[in-house]
């Protein structure tokens, strides 16, 4: 489907020179003099190469239709990440380039949304929150529960975050998968 360059957004998939690209960022620039342009940063799906393109906002680009489906995460090996479609039990392998910064938050059985073009995964969307265990943090200090200060902690997936002073090692907490920030103590 041909669309004007100014309508391209992050997460869209474009076809250029017979290759598929996922849009990492898209910015419309309106200089004081000259023609407005769209600065688009993309990653080639086949090999992960990042490129940056500049189009006039009125130029047409080829946008590819993608389908979002739920998949369960199975495991990771040297070849990539393996997911299963719950209804048909079809399995797909997703490369490390596509998973990117979502990798530390993947847990066995976690349901994620994969954006698919034909049989190729082009993007992954995690649930907003994940429950993880604190494996290393400073000891709990009595009398600090009323303060709003935070202390550093390392989670079971290796991500570093800031937690309230009353959270100790071994505590399960809920974090945002977008940035790893603390939300609450887990209720399980």
Swiss-Prot record:
Compartments where found: Cytoplasm
InterPro entries named in the record: Elong-fact-P_C (IPR015365), NA-bd_OB-fold (IPR012340), Rib_uL2_dom2 (IPR014722), Transl_elong_fac_P/YeiP (IPR020599), Transl_elong_KOW-like (IPR013185), Transl_elong_P/YeiP_cen (IPR001059), Transl_elong_P/YeiP_CS (IPR013852), Transl_elongation_fac_P (IPR011768)
GO-annotated biological processes: peptide biosynthetic process
UniProt xrefs under SMART domains: EFP, Elong-fact-P_C
Gene3D superfamilies assigned to the protein according to its UniProt record, in alphabetical order: 2.30.30.30, Nucleic acid-binding proteins (2.40.50.140)
Keyword check for S-adenosyl-L-methionine: no
Gene Ontology, cellular component aspect: cytoplasm
Pathway assignment: Protein biosynthesis; polypeptide chain elongation
GO molecular function ontology, one term from the record: translation elongation factor activity
Cited Pfam families: EFP, EFP_N, Elong-fact-P_C
Family membership noted in the UniProt record: Belongs to the elongation factor P family.
Alphabetized PANTHER family for the sequence: ELONGATION FACTOR P, TRANSLATION ELONGATION FACTOR KOW-LIKE DOMAIN-CONTAINING PROTEIN
Function: Involved in peptide bond synthesis. Stimulates efficient translation and peptide-bond synthesis on native or reconstituted 70S ribosomes in vitro. Probably functions indirectly by altering the affinity of the ribosome for aminoacyl-tRNA, thus increasing their reactivity as acceptors for peptidyl transferase.
Descriptive protein name: Elongation factor P
UniProt organism field: Rhodopseudomonas palustris (strain TIE-1)
Gene that specifies this protein: efp
């Amino acid at each position: 489907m041909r669309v004007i360059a100014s309508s391209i957004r992050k997460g869209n998939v474009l076809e250029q020179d017979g290759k598929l690209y996922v849009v990492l960022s898209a910015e419309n620039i309106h200089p004081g003099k000259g023609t407005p342009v769209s600065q688009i940063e993309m990653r080639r799906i086949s090999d992960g190469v990042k490129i940056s393109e500049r189009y006039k906002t009125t130029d047409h680009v080829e946008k590819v239709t993608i389908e979002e489906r739920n998949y369960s995460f199975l495991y990771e090996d040297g070849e990539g990440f393996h997911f299963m479609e719950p209804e048909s039990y079809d399995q797909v392998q997703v490369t490390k380039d596509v998973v990117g910064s979502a990798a530390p938050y993947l847990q066995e059985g976690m349901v994620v949304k994969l954006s698919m073009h034909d049989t190729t995964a082009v993007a992954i969307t995690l649930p907003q929150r994940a429950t993880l265990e604190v494996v290393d943090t400073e000891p709990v200090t009595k009398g600090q529960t009323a303060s709003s200060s935070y202390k550093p902690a390392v989670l079971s997936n290796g991500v570093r975050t800031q937690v309230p002073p009353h959270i100790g090692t071994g505590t399960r907490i809920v974090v945002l998968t977008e940035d790893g920030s603390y939300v609450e103590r887990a209720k399980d």
